[in-house]
Amino acid sequence: MPLQGPQRRLLGSLNSTLPATPYLGLTTNQTEPPCLEVSIPDGLFLSLGLVSLVENVLVVTAIAKNRNLHSPMYYFICCLAVSDLLVSMSNVLEMAILLLLEAGVLATQASVLQQLDNIIDVLICGSMVSSLCFLGSIAVDRYISIFYALRYHSIMMLPRVWRAIVAIWVVSVLSSTLFIAYYNHTAVLLCLVTFFVAMLVLMAVLYVHMLARACQHARGIARLHKRQHPIHQGFGLKGAATLTILLGVFFLCWGPFFLHLSLLILCPQHPTCGCVFKNFKLFLTLILCSAIVDPLIYAFRSQELRKTLQEVLLCSW
């Protein structure tokens, strides 16, 4: 990845595939509409990264401390927190280095900066891939716990879970290394976009099926109590709201980034696509928001984990 000065984000591998065209600026041609670029202040970006960092460290600490949380589901949640932690840490580190370079506080050789650039890019890309994998793993774990409840412990045996976790981390590191090494190949971007779509479809199918089963179970209970409509409708609305939050957060936070990659494949030099490319930092900010929201959705809803977290915070004082 050729360095283009300190103004370039270190995560240039995926963004630098965009050819240098006049479409990246505000269009000067009166026949073309001006581009809308959402400016993300560096302070806000760093603040979101630090909040996510602290939040996910607390999740990992709570799960590690409480042996009651040493189960397959919480292991996946813990790994998701580690992935989100790495996403936040790498983005904060990248931004801090850029700010130091721009301020002239940090001076280093171009070759050293190039190596640091590659390492951070691999770290960011690998943590993104692992985050998506563990989001899918949590969905699969919940699906098995509902549809194969009697066989859950025989299916989700700890050795098997640990092998799956190790495999996810290994694949994430290897794939991110290949992605960064061959970032200028269309096949790399296509693989990333396909992977995101596959995870989105997997989560949507599993969670919708779980919601349908839960509503069916609620109808059966309602018929027994002869209160079919109030119970079923209330439960269905609550379940639909939960499903909307789960998939909505996933799509809104991750979708724009992968839309960016898709447009790099489809229309790298089109002026409209160029307007989208200008908001690359916004898309990374949304991924940081996902790293903040994930613990709220998957971890902090557990009463046991909240209790452990409270003990950890009290002990720290």
Swiss-Prot record:
The record's subunit annotation is: Interacts with MGRN1, but does not undergo MGRN1-mediated ubiquitination; this interaction competes with GNAS-binding and thus inhibits agonist-induced cAMP production. Interacts with OPN3; the interaction results in a decrease in MC1R-mediated cAMP signaling and ultimately a decrease in melanin production in melanocytes.
Record's keyword terms, sorted: Cell membrane, G-protein coupled receptor, Glycoprotein, Lipoprotein, Membrane, Palmitate, Receptor, Transducer, Transmembrane, Transmembrane helix
Q: What functional role does this protein have?
A: Receptor for MSH (alpha, beta and gamma) and ACTH. The activity of this receptor is mediated by G proteins which activate adenylate cyclase. Mediates melanogenesis, the production of eumelanin (black/brown) and phaeomelanin (red/yellow), via regulation of cAMP signaling in melanocytes.
Q: Which GO terms describe its molecular function?
A: melanocyte-stimulating hormone receptor activity; ubiquitin protein ligase binding
Q: Which family does the record claim for this protein?
A: Belongs to the G-protein coupled receptor 1 family.
**Gene encoding the protein:** MC1R
- Name the Gene Ontology biological process terms: adenylate cyclase-activating G protein-coupled receptor signaling pathway; intracellular signal transduction; melanin biosynthetic process; negative regulation of tumor necrosis factor production; phospholipase C-activating G protein-coupled receptor signaling pathway; positive regulation of cAMP/PKA signal transduction; positive regulation of transcription by RNA polymerase II; regulation of metabolic process
A Gene Ontology cellular component where this protein is annotated is: cytoplasm
Q: What are the annotated glycosylation sites? A: 29
What is the protein's name according to its record? Answer: Melanocyte-stimulating hormone receptor
